[in-house]
């Protein structure tokens, strides 16, 4: 096993020859497993791994190389087959994790990077919820629970859905999982999709939706949306994309990454189209439902006429209750589908943590929409949103719709694309712009192409106002380096 890491500009010594395109790492054959940054050439021949040029002097990049090489033993012993499933090859690497890894490397090198890439609250779990988890441990409540979740938490979820969403379910129509992500994977993809089925996904989208579809040998069908429409699905365009293979529509409201909220009137239009297609189901991702800014209001898709039978509603505790590490989510839907999802879960992880389930019950007991514990966090999010919106909308060349929920902004910086910056290179898209901000502004953001829209970048405002103020000041200063170049580019 060979493992090596290269960091630039921390140490360029010994790296330039590897990166300049005419050198290679010897002794590794064509069945090498490797991971790396975007500088790594995906094409590799026997005994060689090539790298693209790392950029001009001073550019930041990180290479992690882990290789397991086959050796010629000469003793006639068959060599180990280390090939992987085609499913792995079909999955795209996470750009969110890539930017996080690069930011971490810079921090370790002493660069004061501000991280605005994470999709999790910066608040602590409410005290009453944390105490319920601690009490569960102290009481010895540390054993397996039923696969679908305890009757206590499923009953509490049914009560929540009835009181807050106008939805009627029984406990056997609820599946509690290790986070909402597992519910989506088990429900939206593996349980209802077959090879050849199509999963309809409006873009921008959460990064995992498309990869989940591919894991089930289904085909993701991406429908772009417009900034001028607040990144909401256009019913006419949606209708034009449907056919006999359309199996699942995924809607996320409030949206990650845009913060857009679907108004009831638009959802009703979409529901009328869905009703015309007997095979089509809807997965409604409502994980951000409590992080809303008036006058926006949340509507559960399953509450619309004729949609209860077609809808799989996914929700959880991570975002509203600042419980990302507790890993607790749930699915609600017709028993036929929920039972199937439970069968898949039973053969993978089984039930969610008993301790987390006790904490989840306590969270739901806080009151309507989490009561003061959640509203206090939402008030802080809104203050941060308003601050960033004001600053970004005042910047030259930046377009930004005002998000109505979640804790993300998705501004359009495409007016700066195509420009070349000295000691950096060309800003040819959102990934390059995020690397530019990381290097020049020391701010970690997520490129929009990871979400299906290369014009934009995602900014998380799950950080203190002081942190956001420093970050936006740094971003604004760094853009001064691009404005002359952008003007020259347009003039030519």
UniProtKB/Swiss-Prot annotation:
Alphabetized GO MF terms: L-aspartate:2-oxoglutarate aminotransferase activity; pyridoxal phosphate binding
Q: Where in the cell is it found?
A: Plastid, Chloroplast
The N6-(pyridoxal phosphate)lysine modification is found at: 319
* InterPro entries tied to this protein: Aminotransferase_I/II_large, AspAT/PAT-like, NHTrfase_class1_PyrdxlP-BS, PyrdxlP-dep_Trfase, PyrdxlP-dep_Trfase_major, PyrdxlP-dep_Trfase_small
**Which Pfam family, any one, appears in the UniProt record?**
Aminotran_1_2
Concerning PROSITE patterns, the annotation shows:
AA_TRANSFER_CLASS_1
Listed under catalytic activity are: L-aspartate + 2-oxoglutarate = oxaloacetate + L-glutamate
For biological process, the GO terms are:
amino acid metabolic process; biosynthetic process
Please give the chief subcellular localization of this protein. plastid
Using the record, list the residue span of the signal peptide; answer none if the entry has no such feature. none
What is its EC class?
transferase
- What role is this protein assigned? Prokaryotic-type aspartate aminotransferase. Specific for aspartate and no activity with glutamine, asparagine, alanine, histidine, leucine, methionine, lysine, arginine, tryptophan, tyrosine, phenylalanine or kynurenine.
Q: What is this protein called?
A: Aspartate aminotransferase
The species this protein belongs to is Pinus pinaster
